[in-house]
Amino acid sequence: METPNIISHTNLLSKIDLEKQNPAPIFPTITELKSEARSLFSLAFPTILAALILYARSAISMLFLGHIGELELAGGSLAIAFANITGYSVLAGLALGMDPLCSQAFGAGRPKLLSLTLQRTVLFLLTSSVVIVALWLNLGKIMIYLHQDPSISSLAQTYILCSIPDLLTNSFLHPLRIYLRAQGITSPLTLATLAGTIFHIPMNFFLVSYLGWGFMGVSMAAAASNLLVVIFLVAHVWIAGLHQPTWTRPSSECFKDWGPVVTLAIPSCIGVCLEWWWYEIMTVLCGLLIDPSTPVASMGILIQTTSLLYIFPSSLGLAVSTRVGNELGSNRPNKARLSAIVAVSFAGVMGLTASAFAWGVSDVWGWIFTNDVAIIKLTAAALPILGLCELGNCPQTVGCGVVRGTARPSMAANINLGAFYLVGTPVAVGLTFWAAYGFCGLWVGLLAAQICCAAMMLYVVATTDWEKEAIRARKLTCTEGVDVVITTTQTNGDLSEPLIYVVTVATD
């Protein structure tokens, strides 16, 4: 039998008013800073390790593709780019919609909401995958319509068809990662990713070399590796009993009340895709330059470089999103604010470090990827600009994590739209083609976008009303339709918001 605990909205407001009368110190103590830094590190470090392992696995796939043949490498690269734009970025963005729901639910002590959000998100991603698969089935026709080489388009079609199982696997993998991270469980994620990558190497040799499946084997090996990650993750969590505090057996409830998940997932997806796609647009613009092969190759090297550097702020962004969500769900707005302050401070240090790295290796970095002198010179010219971009990219990425933890993905999406497409794109096109800055003009456009994005994101973080966000978190976790009754009381004719929240708590 479940009995309801009634939490008065008036009492909640009174508690927050009391906090305002006795506010936390403006400057946190050294002990508080150290404690929060440890909390962020415990979440971010395993995430960084997992991301670096995934980066290595991607490099292994490209290495096998390159050894098969130049045409196969081109077809596989085209398929991977199309899959990233239309599939993987979409699923990753949609899955982030569950991030604030899970982290705030965990902080609020709502275990059933955690597992239901996981189940609903998996179903939502599988449903979305049906639409994506329909698009992938027509990749060859789409590429020929866009005047791509028929031979490369045919190979790309074959490669992406072999990637469909991987798309479905990602519909489980992304939600599982967020579900566990919201509870502070990160070690299984790193171990599972490592196991999948170790398995990836012999699987490539077996499918590509032993069975002779060529570049189709590379795609199948990637799908098999991700499937192993999911199996390993589920098995580890289940055997260790890590699921027990929050798991609810799937029922008809997971087919209902999708509103909060979808409402947060769509703007999260838009925000991720707007930024992700901008880099693909830069590659397309390179193809319009004189002698495009050199700038396109250099752009590929630089995007790989910025992807490597992005691992660190993105992992910190995921960590602070979880921390902010947990603290808001627990009705501790001051601790959520502290987490944001510490994370953004770390992001500034990350930006300086990444910038120094880009400047320091500018003359030698290109040699790691190619012996072509023209490509190396172009890469060396753009790397210092890339370094300046990181000064904005690191803070804005972590700031986006803070905003995501407060369940405001629409805010982040609007900022990305304005910064990358209303500022960055005009600057890039204008400098590249009208002012004749060429290849470096594209990167100056990215610099303008990153500066604008960082400024707006940090302004949003700095002006956040944390007490208000704590109330929003209570509403989000208490009005989701799960074992909750909401009673509204009309006062002076005003029915603008609920005045009483009734949360049921299981009792023996």
Swiss-Prot record:
GO molecular function: antiporter activity; xenobiotic transmembrane transporter activity
Keywords: Endosome, Membrane, Transmembrane, Transmembrane helix, Transport
Topology with respect to the bilayer: Multi-pass membrane protein
Domain of life: Eukaryota
Localization, UniProt: Late endosome membrane
One cellular component (GO) term of this entry: late endosome membrane
Entry similarity comment: Belongs to the multi antimicrobial extrusion (MATE) (TC 2.A.66.1) family.
Reported function: May act as a negative regulator of hypocotyl cell elongation in the light.
UniProt-recorded name of the protein: Protein DETOXIFICATION 52
Origin species: Arabidopsis thaliana (Mouse-ear cress)
Source lineage: Eukaryota, Viridiplantae, Streptophyta, Embryophyta, Tracheophyta
